[in-house]
UniProtKB/Swiss-Prot annotation:
Domain of life: Bacteria
Example of a GO biological process term: protein secretion by the type VI secretion system
Region (Disordered): 753-790
Alphabetically ordered keywords of this record: Secreted
Disruption phenotype annotation: Deletion leads to a complete loss of PldA, PldB and VgrG4b secretion.
Function: Part of the H2 type VI secretion system (H2-T6SS) specialized secretion system, which delivers several virulence factors in both prokaryotic and eukaryotic cells during infection. Allows the delivery of the phospholipase effector PldB to target cells where it exerts its toxicity. Also plays a role in VgrG4b and its effector PldA secretion.
Disulfide bonds, paired cysteine numbers: none
Protein name: Type VI secretion system spike protein VgrG5
């Protein structure tokens, strides 16, 4: 029975504080995946309460004589008018989670899963492990390589992550505190202690709290979800995943297609598309009602009873509850309050309005917190390990620290790897310039997503100045590097465009290698100066042809060695003049011919021999013919062979590029596997039962069987062994054959549970009626376990 009208039903307890507050009225709203808020109207005999001391105090609002209520913290307190004895106050009761809505941040989380990120955010606000818990199913939540909170409150960030993953949260209350519960399936929602009967509101007061109004509405929702993404590490793989309705569903084909789907593995994409479809379908069937049962709380299952429409007498998940209470009997005098006069037809007592969904519809929070967008580009500084000036991976990606990042330590853990844009990029060809540690870079974001940064260029600033002072050298275009490690050297290409001083300057700190596969043609319009400070090596593997139109002046400050494999031909227009400081030695293997048109003279030692048109003249102190003696001996030829030049560095040609992936238009839909779950032939015990599907021991998906106890899903490539577990305790093992469509008649009967042999003993004890088979099949372990009779 309800308490008498002159008794107070509602009260407020404030921890560690003595007060005489009485609750005059309250209005509150609480919903799944949202912080609750209760606005309270209070009265007190004291008009001098320390309002500042009341702020942030834990408090418990009691809603019924049985002690049920809502626990939170006082986030607002205000004093109103005073009467002869009572003073009015207004207060707001919210969870500790609400404080996160007042804190905004910009920070980076790396290599953490969503539950781990949520835990860090909560514990950063003093909401420790005893004040929150995760009740998650077997679905794995992979670590996010890079997750950014950007220009959003901590509450919005936490809510967004939950919405993206399909995780919901609700609060559970006690007089000592409130606990934040995260879940991803229906098992995390508790059931209210007792059913609540439906009694149509006829203006009469029931003996017990009841549901006075209850209505159901169906809405059209998307029936199919498709997600697509791109992974630069797997560019040839089309990243697409889809999830659709059960076969045979009578509904229009309404597709929700989105790119990017934010996944790099198809299994992850399939999971996200499944969760997205569940989000669309979560409220396609929705109930709204009104009751005076104060135990109704969002995130709890309501058991409805006594409704004339029998199928509605079932479990309903309360997704939103609006609470309202008034007890004007606490007033012993008139003060300025709307509650004293009442509003509308509600003047005293408690009532609520609620929204609910069927227990079989998986609740997924709607996407109310979109991912923040970065408008335009940002600047950052390239980072790396201590002492390192170039830090990159195999793709030329770098790490940076943004100027808004307060937690970064300017090392190799400040960010994810950022791809670096190039003005040209192909398969083993294009342009590469790795930004170095300490450089300021311009960072863009794919589709404005702060989780997908990439470097688009580098910037100079007052410390990192340009190679040549500006604007004095504004006509110079420069590409200049710095030697690694340690600096002190550089390579440079400089182009000067100033009129009359045009120049291309090249500096190689060490080696210069050229590879020209065909011709090289060089024209020098004026002079050419070559200075080689070491040895010079040249090799011509064919002819060398050279023409000098003026004098050629060659000075050798050491020996000259010339080796000619065949003949040496010299043609001199006027004269040849050779002077040797010591010796000239001519030697021929066969003959030496010296020919002169007019005169030939041999001179040495004061003697000479001259041949001219006048005859042969021999002149010397003594001319001896056949008088013995020996000829002079020359030093001989000792020509040294040249060393071979070293080869220039080689480089390989690039490969053919991978083109865009052609789309298959009108492609036949993916065939589905359909299993009818039944422990016995003809017994549909799994109708509308939640199930979980495992492939080769790994969890893949979950859902609800149809009215006939059947489930359908896309076969997974390479997966042959499936296990299906239903909520009523049954488990089914399925081993796939190579061609599931090519089954013989006996195979199809075997899949339905029939066998082609006669059992020595009955497989089950005969039951008295067909319904008994279904009843026992739906309660494994509860059936008769007596030994069957032959």
């Amino acid at each position: 029975m309800f308490a008498p009208a002159n008794q107070t039903h509602f009260s407020l307890r404030i921890e560690n504080l003595r007060h005489d507050f009485q609750v005059l009225a309250f209005r509150g709203r609480e919903a799944i995946s949202q912080p609750f808020r209760f606005d309270l109207e209070l009265v007190s005999e004291r008009s001098d309460l320390d309002l500042d001391a009341l702020l942030h105090q834990p408090a418990f609002l009691i809603l019924s004589p049985s002690g049920q209520g809502v626990h939170g913290q006082l986030t607002s307190i205000a004093q109103g008018d005073s009467g002869k004895r009572l003073t009015g106050y207004r207060a707001t009761l919210e969870p500790r989670l609400a404080y996160l809505g007042l804190c905004s941040d910009q920070r980076i989380f790396q290599r953490l899963s969503v539950p781990e990120i949520i835990g860090r955010v909560l514990e950063g606000h003093g909401i420790l492990a005893d004040a929150y818990r995760f009740q998650l199913g077997p679905t794995p939540y992979p670590a996010r390589e890079y997750c950014t909170q950007y220009d959003e409150t901590d509450l919005a960030f936490l809510s967004r992550l939950c919405e993206e993953e399909g995780i919901h949260y609700h609060h559970e209350f006690s007089a000592q505190g409130h606990v934040l519960v995260f879940g991803d399936d229906q098992t995390s929602f508790p059931r209210l202690q007792r059913p609540v009967a439906y009694v149509q509101d006829a203006g009469l007061v029931a003996d017990q709290p009841v549901v006075k109004r209850f209505g159901v509405r169906f809405d059209t929702r998307a029936s199919r979800v498709t997600r697509r993404d791109y992974d630069f590490e797997q560019p040839a793989l089309q990243m697409q995943a889809a999830h659709g309705p059960q076969p045979g569903a009578q509904q229009p084909d309404l597709e929700d297609y989105d790119y990017p789907g934010r996944f790099t593995h198809r299994e992850r994409g399939k999971h996200l598309s499944h969760r997205a479809l569940e989000r669309h379908r979560a409220d396609y069937l929705q109930a709204r009602g009104e009751s005076d049962e104060p135990a109704l709380l969002s995130g709890h299952f309501l058991t409805l009873s006594a409704h004339p429409r029998g199928e509605w007498n079932d479990l309903w998940l309360l997704t939103e509850v609006l609470h309202e209470g008034r007890q004007p009997q606490v007033l012993e005098e008139s003060i300025d309050s709307d509650v004293a006069q009442g509003q509308g037809d509600f003047r005293q007592g408690y009532r609520n309005h609620f929204v609910a969904t069927p227990w079989s519809a998986h609740f997924r929070p709607p996407l109310e917190h979109p991912r923040p967008r970065v408008l335009g580009c940002q600047t950052a500084v390239v980072t790396g390990p201590a002492g390192e000036t170039i830090h990159c991976d195999q793709y030329g990606r770098v790490k940076v620290q943004f100027f808004w990042d307060r937690l970064g330590q300017a090392d190799d853990n400040t960010s994810c790897w950022l791809r670096v844009a190039s003005n040209w990029g192909g398969k083993r060809y294009g342009g590469v310039a790795i930004p170095r540690v300490g450089m300021e870079v311009l960072v863009g974001f794919l589709e404005g997503d702060p989780d997908q940064p990439l470097v688009t260029g580098c910037l100079y600033h007052s410390e990192n100045r340009v190679p040549y002072e500006l604007p004095q050298n504004k006509t110079r275009s420069v590409f200049k590097t710095d030697s690694y490690p340690g600096g002190g050297g550089f390579n440079e290409l400089r182009i000067e465009d100033r009129k009359g001083q045009e120049q291309i300057f090249v500096h190689a700190q060490r080696d210069w290698d050229e590879n020209i596969e065909h011709d090289q043609k060089i024209r020098v319009g004026h002079e050419r100066h070559d200075t080689v400070e070491g040895d010079s090596y040249s090799e011509f593997r064919a002819e060398e042809q050279r023409t000098v139109h003026a004098d050629r002046k060659v000075e050798l400050k050491a020996a000259d060695h010339l080796s000619v494999a065949d003949a040496l031909h010299l043609r001199i227009g006027t004269g040849q003049f050779v002077e040797a400081g010591d010796e000239i030695h001519f030697k021929a293997g066969d003959k030496v011919v010296i020919e002169a048109g007019m005169e030939l003279t041999l001179k040495g030692g004061g003697s000479f021999a001259r041949l001219d048109p006048g005859g042969v003249t021999l002149d010397g102190a003594q001319v001896m013919i056949n008088s013995g003696g020996s000829p002079g001996i020359g030093s001989g030829v000792r020509a040294l062979s040249p060393l071979q030049p070293l080869a220039a560095d080689a480089a390989a040609a690039g490969g053919a590029l991978l083109g865009a992936i052609a789309q298959k238009i009108g492609e036949a839909p993916q065939k589905l596997l359909r299993f009818e779950l039944s422990p016995l032939p003809g017994v549909a015990s799994a109708a509308r039962q939640p199930y979980r599907l495992y492939a080769n021991g790994a969890f893949k998906e979950e859902g609800i069987a149809d009215e006939g106890g059947a489930i359908s899903f896309e076969p997974l490539p390479g997966e042959r062994t499936y296990r299906i577990e239903t909520a009523n305790g049954h488990a089914y093992e399925v081993e796939m054959v190579d061609q599931p469509d090519a089954l013989q008649a006996d195979d199809r009967l075997a899949q339905q549970g029939f066998r082609d042999y006669r059992a020595e003993m009955p497989q089950h004890k005969p039951r008295s009626a067909p319904d008994a088979y279904r009843r026992d099949a739906s309660r494994p372990g509860a059936a008769d376990k007596d030994e069957p009779t032959p």
